[in-house]
């Protein structure tokens, strides 16, 4: 069944445009509250957000919805997504909410939901919520004496700071490291610099002056140019770029070069394997991760399990098969020893631990493999199903046959935008570019004719 509201990472869209309206946010609160209002105990929801202007509006709407459904609401204010997941468990809540559109510009916003175990909701539970959203929710409202209360919770940032600090091995200190960190004017603008400073680093911070409209604006993990300049300017040993809700990270080495999530997973996998912390004798990544990562792991006797795109699917596979390292090329790194979802800061701390323990530079530590040439292009669509067209399917089959022994092809609809993503990788860059361009042309022609 096609889903109307939920994508690969919750509900997302332009603020004050369906589905990201206060009316729907309130209805999501009622619907989700109804589903998790089970048992005889007093029910609770924890609600966090990033720094977007629309966060105030959506926060109040969701508080109204959940309290109307009979849940007490704990309001956290701006805080990283992994902190919401952690606090959902530690505060014994029935459900957790993060209001954020992650790396998107401020005009967008989104709703991510976590179960009482701190994990993102399954497709089945999201389908239950969608089913309720199509019904009359007035029958689900709490009785007058059962309406929930709302309370703003103080001190939650300190809880997350202590949690993050505990993930750095006790024999490691960050003294002697100059770290430049870009907080994307987002949810981690207070906590991330504090963690690094308390662990002994010399910290230089940018992207820590949110005003409601500058989240991810020329800063953060999707726009690391400002961080590259700052690393060069202050001669930092490393740069750390988070995104708006701090669930992903990109590293800049001392030379200003960017290190993506694939390289970071390689570092952590190798380091944890050496210390016998790695479980599953490998890691979990998505179909978008570079073939070079797969070859790197294979050469060291480790496996790479692939899932469809979305960190929630990475986490599901990790839980099912007992892996403790997983992630995405984009910088979502999930370390299940320390959390239930991607955590950019905690992942960065594992890289810093490897740097300190080896005594090598960040560039030496983080360049674990040579990436295979990879090209990703998007085709914007306004409707229809071009991937079901016979002409497109034949072009895809021909491309897959050509790449069978030397590369990979991934074509998929975006889960968050009206796009079709075309990615190919292989040892021959010219071949990859030709294949992608031909497929883009075929899909575009079918789209235009539709």
Swiss-Prot record:
Q: A Gene Ontology MF term for this entry?
A: phosphomannomutase activity
What note does UniProt attach to the cofactor annotation?
Binds 1 Mg(2+) ion per subunit.
Give residues where Phosphoserine occurs.
Answer: 102
The record's listing under PROSITE patterns reads: PGM_PMM
Keyword list, A-Z: Isomerase, Magnesium, Metal-binding, Phosphoprotein
What does the PTM comment state?
Answer: Activated by phosphorylation.
Locate the residues binding Mg(2+). 102, 243, 245, 247
Q: Which domain of life is it from?
A: Bacteria
* Gene Ontology cellular component annotations, sorted alphabetically: cytosol
Query: Which EC class, in a word?
Result: isomerase
The record's EC number reads: 5.4.2.10
Q: Per the UniProt entry, what are the Gene Ontology biological process annotations, in alphabetical order?
A: carbohydrate metabolic process; peptidoglycan biosynthetic process; UDP-N-acetylglucosamine biosynthetic process
Q: Which reaction does it catalyse?
A: alpha-D-glucosamine 1-phosphate = D-glucosamine 6-phosphate
| Pfam families, per the entry | PGM_PMM_I (PF02878), PGM_PMM_II (PF02879), PGM_PMM_III (PF02880), PGM_PMM_IV (PF00408)
Active site positions, chain numbering: 102
Q: Which cofactor does it need?
A: Mg(2+)
Family membership: Belongs to the phosphohexose mutase family.
Q: What does this protein do?
A: Catalyzes the conversion of glucosamine-6-phosphate to glucosamine-1-phosphate.
What name goes with this protein?
Phosphoglucosamine mutase
**Source organism lineage?**
Bacteria, Pseudomonadati, Pseudomonadota, Alphaproteobacteria, Hyphomicrobiales
């Amino acid at each position: 069944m096609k889903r109307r509201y939920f994508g690969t990472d919750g509900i997302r869209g332009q603020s004050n445009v369906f589905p990201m309206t206060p009316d729907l946010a309130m209805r999501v609160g009622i619907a989700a509250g109804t589903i998790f209002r089970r048992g005889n105990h007093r029910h609770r929801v924890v609600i966090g957000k990033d720094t977007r202007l629309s966060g105030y509006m959506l926060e109040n709407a969701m508080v109204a919805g959940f309290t109307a459904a009979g849940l007490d609401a704990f309001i956290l204010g701006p805080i990283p997504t992994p902190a919401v997941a952690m606090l959902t468990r530690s505060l014994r809540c029935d459900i957790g909410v993060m209001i954020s559109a992650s790396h998107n510009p401020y005009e967008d916003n989104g709703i991510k939901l976590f179960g009482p175990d701190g994990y993102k909701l399954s497709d089945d539970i999201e389908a239950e919520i969608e089913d309720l959203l199509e019904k009359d929710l007035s029958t689900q409202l709490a009785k007058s004496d059962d309406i929930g209360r709302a309370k703003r919770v103080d001190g939650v940032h300190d809880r997350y700071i202590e949690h993050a600090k505990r993930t750095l091995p006790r024999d490691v200190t960050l003294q002697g490291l100059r770290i430049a960190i870009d907080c994307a004017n987002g949810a981690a603008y207070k906590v991330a610099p504090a963690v690094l400073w308390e662990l002994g680093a010399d910290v230089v911070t940018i992207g820590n002056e949110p005003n409601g409209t500058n989240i991810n604006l020329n800063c953060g993990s999707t726009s690391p140019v400002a961080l590259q300049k700052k690393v060069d300017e202050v001669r930092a040993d490393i740069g750390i770029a988070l995104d708006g809700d701090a669930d992903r990270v990109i590293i800049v080495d001392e030379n200003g070069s960017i290190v993506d999530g694939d390289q970071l997973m390689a570092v952590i996998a190798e380091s944890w394997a050496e210390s016998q912390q790695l479980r599953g004798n490998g890691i979990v990544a998505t179909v978008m991760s570079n073939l070079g990562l797969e070859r790197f792991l294979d050469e060291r006797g480790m496996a790479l399990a692939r899932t469809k795109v979305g960190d929630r699917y990475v986490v599901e596979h990790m839980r099912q098969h007992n892996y403790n390292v997983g992630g995405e090329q984009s910088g979502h790194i999930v370390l299940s020893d320390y959390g239930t979802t991607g955590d950019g800061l905690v992942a960065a701390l594992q890289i810093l631990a490897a740097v300190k323990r080896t005594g090598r530079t960040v560039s030496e530590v983080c360049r674990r493999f040579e990436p295979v040439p990879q090209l990703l292009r998007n085709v914007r669509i306004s409707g229809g199903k071009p991937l079901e067209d016979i002409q497109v399917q034949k072009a895809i089959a021909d491309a897959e046959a050509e790449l069978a022994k030397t590369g990979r092809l991934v074509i998929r609809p975006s889960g968050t935008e009206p796009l079709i993503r075309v990615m190919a990788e292989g040892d021959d860059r010219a071949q990859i570019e030709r294949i992608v361009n031909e497929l883009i042309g075929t899909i575009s022609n079918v789209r235009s004719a539709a």
